[in-house]
Amino acid sequence: SILDNVIGSTTFKKADLCAHTWKYKSPGCAFTSENLLAKAGGEIAAKKVEEKLSTYYQKAGFSSSNTYFKFNEDGTFNAKIDGKSWSGTYTFDEKTHAIDLKGRLLLSLNGFATKNTSGISILFESKKLLTIIQTLTALSGNTTLGTIGEISKNYDGIRVGFDLSK
């Protein structure tokens, strides 16, 4: 459904977030409002962005075995991004789906966690996602990753990241 591409369009509780270890499935993309999704060309725009991200994510080496998130009821999280461990604390707002991750290396990310048809999506502004990936993977010279930051500049209100499944 088109609403799968709009953040906050479904009910999502902290208990749902904490229910599983969420493993990388594919690139994720959603818009912050139905209006912005419609302006961008709807699901077609979201699919285009996901296809582009897929190419870059494959080159970067993301897989279900090396990229995952585990959220705990006590407000802590453990994650691996391309095999690099990242852990810390988080807050999650069930109304807005805003998630704030504060981790080691002074890395923090504000984004959104939302339910989709096959699991959840964890999504961020592309430049913030790029910073985390570069810092954790030491791939700052990798031109593939640089493109991730460029992908969304043509779309207002888009967030990118990871679609995750159980």
Residue map of PLM features:
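Lipid interaction determinants
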Residues: 1-74, 78-80, 84-86, 94-166
